[in-house]
Amino acid sequence: MISNNLIEQLEQRGLIAQVTDKTRLSERLYQGQISLYCGFDPTADSLHLGHLVPLLCLKRFQLVGHKPIILVGGATGLIGDPSFKAGERKLNDIDTVHQWVNKIREQVEPFLDFDCGNHSATIENNHNWFSHINVLTFLRDIGKHFSVNQMMNKEAVKQRLSRTDSGISFTEFSYNLLQSYDFAYLNKNHKVELQIGGSDQWGNITSGIDLTHRLNRRSVYGLTVPLITKADGSKFGKTEGNTIWLDAKKTSPYQFYQFWLNTADADVYRFLKLFTFIDLNAIDALEEQDKKNDKAPQAQYVLANEITEMVHGKEGLSAAQRITASLFTGNPHDMREEDFSQLAQDGIPIVRLETDAELQKALVSAQLAPSRSQARTLIQSSSISVNGKKQLKPEYIFTSEDRLLDRYTLLRRGKKYYCLIIWQ
């Protein structure tokens, strides 16, 4: 099962930003199974899209027979990684961080196989070893291996020191030592030979390689995946300023699906290589097919379907597709209670109204019309639909028949603008 060209495959997908000693790492991977890890600090109660590429990279290694370890930073999450951050992170209390650790553990489990023999995935928490090290031992046994001069020359630290509005605290400055020790500890106790992470972690990874060599006298490797950018230069992983989370309670499967569906043509084929396991030849064939097709490209649908199912499962994908189809046609009658809940969460604007409200008032309250007179004009011009049906009566008052599931009514102005009424 061990692949002798995994590094080459990752490069072809654009998944390698930096790698230490690529030739020797490739040779080591060819020789047999290795253990590798990627760390995820609990800086929130959910992972977001930025975590997805390294997480899926672990899966790519596991699929060819290597053993992945998820390291949840129960200790490092209490400190905060300063890497390329403009200012000091807010320190979260221990109870909060421990709650986030548990949520992240639950979140990563579906991505890897924890029951596949000798390459089963495992999850570790660095709080388990740091909680047993006192400060004197750490400074004597670990700190002595670090040069402050070299630490200050790390690009992430240099950027912080160059800012006049914020420096860097000793707390965050010491983060590099903690992450480095993680690598040395995992190498000694779990035979880990490779750390992967985002390209912003390069300085921390190379420090860990150096410390592991000093403490354990073993050769280990580092590999970073690129930080994802969009072709137009805008930030990846956000929509209208809001982070796209992996937790369905923070970003609904519908909104998650829409994010990928709205991927620009300039990005979509690259994202298929980065985020899916579709064969590269199949992706190239899809691109050629889309170029020849006069209709809308299919790549966005393939991308949205693949990743939504991967993160939210078949039910999450089905719900996202059902909601999308209902909004496209303007007919919400096939939607379920949980579908309306997703729309209310973050899908479209909502307005809560009392019984027997007028349509004109609802349109103004929903900001689909700036005034009652404009609402009247929109109704008379056939621009307003109620649950998919044109409503032409300017003085229309909602009835119980307009309430889907006895609670919801979908308003639409034109083809693009929606609002969900939730009846009180």
From Swiss-Prot:
Keyword Protein biosynthesis carried by entry: yes
Positions annotated to bind ATP: 238
GO biological process: tyrosyl-tRNA aminoacylation
CDD domains: S4 (cd00165), TyrRS_core (cd00805)
Pfam families the UniProt entry points to: SYY_C-terminal (PF22421), tRNA-synt_1b (PF00579)
Keywords: Aminoacyl-tRNA synthetase, ATP-binding, Cytoplasm, Ligase, Nucleotide-binding, Protein biosynthesis, RNA-binding
Enzyme Commission number(s) of this protein: 6.1.1.1
Reaction(s) catalysed (UniProt annotation): tRNA(Tyr) + L-tyrosine + ATP = L-tyrosyl-tRNA(Tyr) + AMP + diphosphate + H(+)
Chief place where the protein resides: cytoplasm
Domain S4 RNA-binding intervals: 357-414
Positions bound to L-tyrosine: 37, 175, 179
Gene Ontology CC terms: cytosol
Subcellular localization: Cytoplasm
Motif ('KMSKS' region): 235-239
Record motif 'HIGH' region, residues: 42-51
One Gene Ontology molecular-function label: RNA binding
Record flagged with keyword Nucleotide-binding: yes
Assembly information from the UniProt record: Homodimer.
Family in the record: Belongs to the class-I aminoacyl-tRNA synthetase family. TyrS type 1 subfamily.
Protein task: Catalyzes the attachment of tyrosine to tRNA(Tyr) in a two-step reaction: tyrosine is first activated by ATP to form Tyr-AMP and then transferred to the acceptor end of tRNA(Tyr).
Protein's name in the database: Tyrosine--tRNA ligase
Organism of derivation: Hamiltonella defensa subsp. Acyrthosiphon pisum (strain 5AT)
